[in-house]
Amino acid sequence: MVIIYIFLFLSSAIIDSTGLAKAQKLDAIGGKGGKQWDDGADHDNVAKVYIRGGLEGIQYIKFDYVKDGKTIDASIHGVSGSGFTQTFEIDYQNSEYIVSVDGYYDKSGTMQALEFKTNLKTSEVIGYPKGTTKFSLGGVNGKMVIGFHGSAGKVLNSIGAYLTTAPPTKSQLVGGLTGGEPWDDGSNYDGVKKISVTYISTLIRSINVDYEKDGQVVTRYHGMKNGDTEEFVIDYPNEYLISVEGTYNILPDDNVLVIRSLIFKTSKGRISPTYGFVSGTKFVLESQGNAIVGFYGRDGGAFDAIGVYFSPIPS
């Protein structure tokens, strides 16, 4: 089996009305037959993939896209004959997106099988890849697929993709989900430079976060200031914050659920001391290949809950 990898060096930029690059167009790979088709790059995400297959290979492909929160029903590329239709759904409402596509085509130039990978899962191989040439589209860290193009006639002959920068994703909120007041630093930062944690013998009181944004330091503070304070410095941009671990438990005297301890980890393998008191349910906020670029949570008399925003670590 021959394997071909197609990344950004076989591509062109799609420019929007402001003169900025909206998407990167990856050349279509596969056979030379059929007529060209192009769904364009004016989408926010892909919602669903439809593939019709038969004895000759993939007969057609079709996509549902997302634009401004609504799904768009795109055209069928190819024709429908006797065979079977398989689908692959992307949970775009929960920040899932396609990151790459593996494909297989035969000597006649007919696409035989496709496999889609998202930031959360991988589809089954749709079709039959035996005795074919394999290729890969995408797989670029920090990028997502927002559109497709290619060629098709009586079968699907080739496929290419449009890539754009992937948005930050939001973790679950852990800890006391009803106590205190909500706060949200957002995700519009380049990275985290320093975290200051204030704690007492039984719980976390507050966190103070220094973010970097366009070369400037932006500081956000959440919680109560009384207690012991320690700092954990991240050597951004040479190092990234990648993980927050900790525990949460009920305070017996107050019957409220709060964050009891915190630990931070970086992309260089450094681990902070344990701040606070380890007690109760353990949690880990981490996403492979991603850095933490923002925090949100709840606080009142104590530091009640914490969540983070992830963004891909630059290649």
From Swiss-Prot:
GO terms for molecular function: carbohydrate binding. Pfam families: Jacalin. Residues 1-23 form the signal peptide. Residues 24-165, 168-312 form the Jacalin-type lectin domain. CDD domains: Jacalin (cd09612). Keywords: Lectin, Repeat, Signal. Belongs to the jacalin lectin family. This is Jacalin-related lectin 10.
